[in-house]
Regions:
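Short, flexible, mixed-charge glycine/proline-rich loop motifs
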Residues: 1-3, 29-30, 267, 350-356
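Iron-sulfur-associated redox domains of electron-transfer enzymes in respiratory
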Residues: 48-349, 355, 368-379
């Protein structure tokens, strides 16, 4: 960490504190969007890996089943899930399925809720970072959040119903899934695509060498929800959109925050909301940044897979699982306090801001406005002195005092040898 404050500036909920010149994540405020791990110039923030724990599970002889996020297609440059499934079998997994089958049940639940007309507005609950954002920072919008499990949890419940004794591991590009899995109690671990790449390399598994191998009688079935990881993907999972709502996709932290701030002014709007710009294909642990074309190419690959899938494969037949997908999303207190006006003025005065004209709102400290900075100081998230104009003014003032009180004659010249300053001794 080199005092650049880029992570503070970029964090949508200001869940980062700066103490002793080090930026640290405030766990209770973090929504686990993972954005700070991507934009840190020094790579000072890393994602905790569960790889060693999963290795122990795989080596224990337990029946381990993987639930694989459909964005694997773009991250690993594949066009067939069977290739990934074979690779997982080589690692010791008993079986693997696409999380999209759980997403299909989620879409069905959304359809039922939309047709009931009980929601003024409707926000999808597939993204755990969005759910956390609403729970902790926009609790008034909880009335619009779909009371439905995420696709990962829905699929885990399906697998648990079929294999009660199995260990279930989710594989995907999302950091927020780690907390969601831990809180659910039905998922035994989460591996990111970064973890999988490391594991494949460690075991000398080359996906390109598996491409031409097929699993006899093991072809996957078509599923509209395989488009979930891209922007507008949830909308594509509906065979027909229920009438009565305007449907739109909102992705990226800034657009999500903007939508939530204004949602009370909307009516009959369905919001497919993802914290990651362009959807899960651009998740913090996706590998799309390593491919030419980035998230746009990744979106194209998933779309191609989705279209080919529904065109060539038999529709997936869902048996009656008897699974309850209802989910309550309670409000979460984030423990920050709004400072009284007198405290704001007192904090600003300490750094030479005595009037509104002194509040430059330059954003160098990581906060959009000087008053936002005062809020952070009041809550103990940063130091008041971390203010570029204040530090510059103080440094210039100190330099002036040193020059004027030096026992030596001092003359300051610019690069063209014009005199800029001279003390009394000079």
């Amino acid at each position: 960490c080199k005092d650049c404050y880029k992570c503070v500036r970029e964090c949508p909920v200001k869940a980062i504190e700066v103490k002793d010149h080090q930026a640290r994540i405030i766990e209770s405020r973090c929504i686990l969007c993972g954005h700070c791990t991507l934009i840190c110039p020094q790579n000072a923030k890393i994602v905790h890996s569960s790889l060693e724990d999963i290795k122990q599970i795989l080596n224990s002889g337990a029946k381990v089943i993987a639930s694989v996020a459909p964005s694997f297609i773009s991250s690993f440059g594949l066009s067939d899930f069977n290739v990934f499934k074979i690779a997982l079998a080589k690692l010791g997994f008993f079986d693997a399925e696409e999380t999209a089958y759980g997403a299909e049940l989620v879409t069905q639940q959304y359809k039922t809720l939309l047709e009931s007309k009980q929601f003024k507005n409707f926000i999808t609950s597939a993204c755990p970072a969005v759910c956390r954002l609403i729970q902790a920072y926009y609790p008034k919008a909880l009335q619009y959040l779909a009371p439905v499990d995420s696709p990962m949890i829905a699929h885990a419940k399906m697998l648990r119903k079929q294999h009660p004794d199995a260990k279930i591991v989710f594989i995907g590009p999302c950091i927020a899934k780690k907390r969601e899995a831990m809180e659910s109690g039905i998922i035994d671990g989460v591996l990111t695509f970064d973890d999988m790449q490391e594991l494949f390399h460690e075991r000398n598994i080359v996906l390109d060498e598996i491409i031409n191998i097929s699993l006899e009688n093991k072809r996957t079935t078509a599923c509209l929800s395989k488009a979930y990881p891209i922007s507008h993907g949830i909308l594509k999972s509906f065979p027909e959109l229920p009438k009565g709502y305007d449907y739109m996709a909102v992705d990226g932290p800034d657009r999500c925050v903007d939508a939530l701030q204004n949602i009370d002014n909307l009516e009959n709007v369905f919001l497919e909301m993802n914290i990651c710009k362009d959807g899960c294909v651009n998740g913090p642990c996706s590998l799309s940044v390593n491919i030419k074309g980035g998230s746009i190419k990744a979106t194209s690959e998933v779309l191609k897979y989705y279209k080919n899938d529904i065109r060539t494969l038999a529709p997936h037949q869902y048996e009656e699982y008897g699974i309850d997908l209802n989910k309550l999303y309670p409000r979460i207190r984030n423990n920050s306090m709004p400072p009284p006006e007198r405290e704001i003025k007192s904090i600003l005065a300490k750094i030479g801001k005595h009037s509104e004209a002194d509040e430059l709102n330059c954003g160098a400290c990581g906060y959009a406005t000087c008053r936002d900075k005062a809020w952070a100081v009041y809550n103990g998230y940063t130091d008041a002195e971390i203010c570029l104009p204040y530090m510059r003014e103080r440094a210039e003032s100190l330099s002036y005092e040193i020059i004027q009180h030096s026992p030596n004659g001092i003359i300051l010249l610019d690069s063209d040898f014009y005199i800029q300053d001279i003390n009394n001794k000079g």
